């Protein structure tokens, strides 16, 4: 596949991934959303179906990595890093585009949520929970969770380890499936399996950090959150932002090495 196919495929696929995955986060979080408070099960399945859809659509163009950790794991497995920068560029651009599309689709809900005194504070606001106060002190705005991940308990080693472990599981599941005969991605069955692996990771390992398991899934939307003209949006929590980038890259690299030792 050509560099242009890779870039276009990763941009489109990652944009779809963030549109559908970030969209479910918006749906369950924002005021005036019909799905508000649908819960963690909706988020886990929403992200799984997002991965499934994006992988199926973009697979013929780029192989549907959609995740720098996947690109790193496959590069280690194959010993070929030549297209890595192209994959990374398409993935980051796509993630940012997807986050902007979520904002467009939920524009009214964002405005309603961020101008609600009970949510953002101010005169007449009710007392916020201790968790909300702690989040604000750490620089996390009231809608940052729609865009990116954040830990329930801030513990650098634990948070990093959780992202490494979750991404390792994802990559091992992907690498052991292998590419289909045409080399154009996981195919229909592979996309389905990978989607349900993501659901499983979300349900079992998502509690501590929100399971980024993908550097651009967190970084791209976090950049968009910082840039968008959202009222009362608060901080983008840059002090935490390195963990959902570095952790998945380490997990992907370990999975690539383990695959070569145990499965190749």
Swiss-Prot record:
Membrane topology per record: Multi-pass membrane protein
Keywords: Cell membrane, Membrane, Repeat, Transmembrane, Transmembrane helix, Transport
GO cellular component term, pick one: plasma membrane
Pfam families the UniProt entry points to: MIP (PF00230)
Reactions accelerated catalytically: glycerol(in) = glycerol(out)
Keyword 4Fe-4S attached: no
GO MF, one annotated term: glycerol channel activity
Ranges that cross the membrane: 6-26, 38-58, 88-108, 159-179, 185-205, 243-263
Keyword Metal-binding listed: no
Induction summary: By glycerol.
Record family assignment: Belongs to the MIP/aquaporin (TC 1.A.8) family.
Full protein name: Probable glycerol uptake facilitator protein
Upper lineage: Bacteria, Bacillati, Actinomycetota, Actinomycetes, Kitasatosporales
């Amino acid at each position: 596949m050509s560099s242009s196919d890779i870039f276009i495929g990763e941009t489109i696929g990652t944009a779809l991934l963030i549109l559908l995955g970030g969209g479910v986060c918006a749906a369950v979080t924002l005021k005036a959303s019909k799905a508000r408070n649908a819960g963690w099960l909706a988020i886990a399945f929403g992200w799984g179906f997002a991965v499934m859809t994006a992988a199926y659509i973009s697979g013929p163009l780029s192989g549907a990595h959609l995740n720098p950790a996947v690109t790193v794991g496959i590069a280690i497995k194959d010993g070929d890093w030549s297209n890595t920068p192209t994959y990374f560029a398409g993935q980051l651009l796509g993630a940012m585009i997807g986050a902007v599309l979520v904002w467009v689709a939920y524009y009214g809900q964002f405005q309603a949520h961020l101008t609600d005194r009970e949510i953002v504070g101010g005169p007449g606001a009710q007392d916020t929970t201790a968790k909300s106060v702690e989040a604000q002190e750490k620089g996390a705005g009231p809608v940052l969770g729609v865009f990116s991940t954040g830990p329930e308990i801030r513990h650098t080693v634990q948070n990093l380890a959780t992202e490494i472990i979750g991404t390792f599981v994802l990559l091992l599941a992907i690498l052991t499936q292998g590419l289909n005969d045409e080399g154009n991605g996981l195919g229909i069955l592979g996309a389905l399996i990978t989607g349900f692996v993501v659901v499983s990771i979300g349900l079992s390992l998502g509690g501590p950090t929100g399971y980024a398991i993908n550097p651009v899934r967190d970084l791209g939307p976090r950049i968009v959150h910082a840039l968008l003209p959202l009222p009362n949006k608060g901080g983008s929590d840059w002090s935490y932002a390195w963990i959902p980038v570095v952790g998945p890259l380490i997990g992907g690299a370990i999975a690539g090495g383990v695959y070569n030792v145990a499965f190749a």
